[in-house]
C-alpha cells in the first residue's frame, strides 16, 4: 500500500508541473477498483479424519463467493486423509502461515479429526488469541466442543452435533442449524454444512452475496 501511495504522489507531482491529468485519473480509478475488490481472508484447519463435507463445503462455497479461503494442514506435510478415506492436499501447512491477515478461522468436525485439531497446541493458541482479540471463529459438528473447552462459549448461544451438545455446559444450547453469537459461529453437522457456509459468507461479504451463492448452487432452504 505504501508503494501505491508513493506512486500516486509521483503522478500528483507530474500534474502540478503540467503533465497529463488523464493518466493519473486512470491510475487512481484502477487503484480504487482494486481496493474495493480486496477479498476477505479465511483459514480452515484440517487434520487426518476431518469430516469431508463439513470442511470442503465451506471451501467450495467461500471460493464461489470470491473469498480467499486457505486450507491448512496441522501436520508437517500437506497430505490429509478425511474421515471417509479421501486423500487431499491442503494449500499450506500450519508452519507456512502467519495468519496476520485472517478475517476468520474455521474448524470442521469429524472424528478423529476434531480430536487431533484440539491436541495441536499451536492451533488452540492461535484460536484463543484470535478470539480474544475479537476475531471471528467458527466450528461445526463436534468442533464446538473444542470451543467450549477453550472458554469461547461461556454465556453464549451455541449448537453442535447432538452427542456433543451435553459437553457445552457453559453455553445456552440450541437446536438451530447455525447459531451466531458475537464473533462465534457454531453449527450442528454434515446436514447443516451449506447453511453454515452461507452464514459465514454472509458475515464476511453480506447477505446479498450469501443469497447469490445459495441461488447459484440451487440450494432450497427447508
Q: Across the structure, where does each feature detected by a protein language model lie?
A:
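Short, Lys/Arg-enriched N-terminal segments with co-localized hydrophobic residues
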Residues: 23-38
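Active-site-adjacent pocket-lining segments in enzyme domains
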Residues: 41-44, 50, 64-73, 92-222
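Short N-terminal binding/cap micro-motifs at the start of the first secondary-structure element
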Residues: 50-54, 79
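Short, solvent-exposed amphipathic alpha-helices that sit
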Residues: 57-64
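N-terminal beta-loop-helix "entrance" segment that forms/cooperates
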Residues: 72-91
Amino acid at each position: 500500500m505504501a508503494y501505491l501511495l508513493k506512486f500516486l504522489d509521483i503522478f500528483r507531482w507530474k500534474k502540478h508541473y503540467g503533465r497529463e491529468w488523464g493518466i493519473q485519473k486512470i491510475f487512481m480509478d484502477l487503484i480504487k477498483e482494486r481496493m474495493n475488490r480486496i477479498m476477505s481472508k479465511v483459514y480452515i484447519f484440517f487434520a487426518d479424519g476431518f469430516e469431508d463435507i463439513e470442511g470442503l463445503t465451506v471451501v467450495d462455497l467461500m471460493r464461489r463467493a470470491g473469498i480467499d479461503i486457505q486450507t491448512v494442514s496441522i501436520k508437517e506435510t500437506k497430505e490429509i486423509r478425511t474421515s471417509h478415506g479421501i486423500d487431499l492436499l491442503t494449500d499450506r501447512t500450519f508452519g507456512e502461515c502467519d495468519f496476520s491477515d485472517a478475517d476468520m478461522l474455521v474448524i470442521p468436525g469429524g472424528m478423529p479429526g476434531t480430536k487431533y485439531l484440539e491436541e495441536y497446541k499451536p492451533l488452540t493458541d492461535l484460536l484463543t488469541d484470535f478470539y480474544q482479540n475479537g476475531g471471528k471463529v467458527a466450528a461445526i459438528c463436534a468442533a464446538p466442543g473444542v470451543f467450549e473447552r477453550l472458554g469461547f462459549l461461556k454465556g453464549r448461544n451455541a449448537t453442535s452435533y447432538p452427542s456433543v451438545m451435553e459437553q457445552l455446559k457453559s453455553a445456552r444450547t440450541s437446536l438451530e442449524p447455525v447459531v451466531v453469537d458475537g464473533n462465534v459461529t457454531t453449527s450442528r453437522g454434515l446436514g447443516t454444512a451449506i447453511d453454515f457456509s452461507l452464514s459465514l459468507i454472509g458475515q464476511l461479504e453480506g447477505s446479498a452475496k450469501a443469497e447469490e451463492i445459495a441461488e447459484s448452487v440451487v440450494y432450497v432452504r427447508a
